[in-house]
């Protein structure tokens, strides 16, 4: 079953390579979507794929790369629409 999820991650998540870390994890899991910095200092991610792949992806990004400090990790289920191909850094 395909599912899409939106993640809002706060803490020390910008300037530590988090977007590249998230992209690498998403590509490993075969997910499609994107990751971007938000003006308020958070990171926003939209990922679409199989539930098992999303859960594995979440385990990685809930901690982030070395140097990151995740203080809040918000997950919202969304409808999968298949619009994204690959996983992009925005």
Residue ranges, per PLM feature:
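Intrinsically disordered, low-complexity, mixed-charge
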Residues: 1-90
